[in-house]
């Protein structure tokens, strides 16, 4: 069952988790940050995510203003996803998670992520 919070009464951390705390959401944002912008690329980069779950996460991220969808083909409809200003700002959270993970849980082996974190 999905969590629901009264965001008016909760701390900022709880409100943030209400948006990005579902399984896979942060990883989808990570991969869009790394340049995986098409649905098929995201499906491959998030190994193990189901198609319906990826669609759900992208839809929610779009509704919450983290990503925008741009169609590059009408027939069949094909879209790319890009971070909005709000999504770009979330990179700071990704960097903090990356730093914490490498400090406390071992060395980084993901070069593209390390390069992304050096930017901005």
Spans of features found by a protein language model:
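Short amphipathic alpha-helical/adjacent loop interface patches that line ligand
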Residues: 36, 46, 58, 87, ...
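Basic amphipathic alpha-helical segments that dock to polyanions
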Residues: 54, 58-64
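Basic, amphipathic "hinge/linker" alpha-helix immediately C-terminal to the N-terminal HTH DNA-binding motif
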Residues: 21, 73-97
């Amino acid at each position: 069952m999905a969590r629901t919070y009264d965001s008016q009464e909760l701390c900022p951390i709880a409100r943030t988790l209400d948006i990005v705390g579902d399984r896979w959401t942060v990883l989808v944002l990570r991969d869009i940050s790394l340049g995986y912008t098409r649905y098929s690329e995201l499906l491959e980069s998030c190994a193990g995510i189901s198609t319906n779950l990826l669609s759900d996460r992208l839809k929610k991220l779009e509704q919450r203003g983290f990503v925008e969808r741009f169609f590059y083909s009408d027939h069949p409809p094909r879209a790319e996803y890009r971070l909005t200003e709000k999504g770009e700002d979330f990179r700071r959270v990704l960097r903090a998670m990356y730093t914490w993970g490498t400090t406390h849980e071992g060395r980084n082996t993901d070069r593209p992520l390390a390069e992304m974190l050096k930017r901005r």
